[in-house]
């Protein structure tokens, strides 16, 4: 079973978890605390009007990570793993601040009842992270969060298996983020953009956009590219 297949298996029976609920609570508090940071003000200056859920996810994730005392403020980009709720293949749900923020931002921008989608997204991010052990130079939390957030967004939009596969591929082809950005304004910005891209990918998949059937493990796909 490929990593993409393992992630899609998570979508079959998504279940709310205490880890997801706790992550959502932390995210909501941090997003409010960071909404007046200079990074968020700069983003708002580019698009002063509400520009849909993807834009709201970008703003909220950036706000949460640029809040005073947040992960970006300290220059940290940890990922970590929760001790319970293992995903297929043995990966525990990723619950580092960057991963959790990106997944929660994507899910909450699309609805309120999102604990199950967030739980599945955190597990998907952990599976993506496990394949990026040698991704030197890349911000592994950000690029793996893009995959997890894509699954969460797809679940919130009610996508079927084929559409979810396409959404994951669209996320993978746009995944980016540099370790060198840690401690700068670009760190929360690139994490927020991952949440934006995740929602956009799910929306495009719902409209019929396609992508690689094996966007993660394929010979010219996500893992080989980022680990080269």
Regions found by a protein language model. Name each.
Residues 1-228:
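N-terminal core-entry segment
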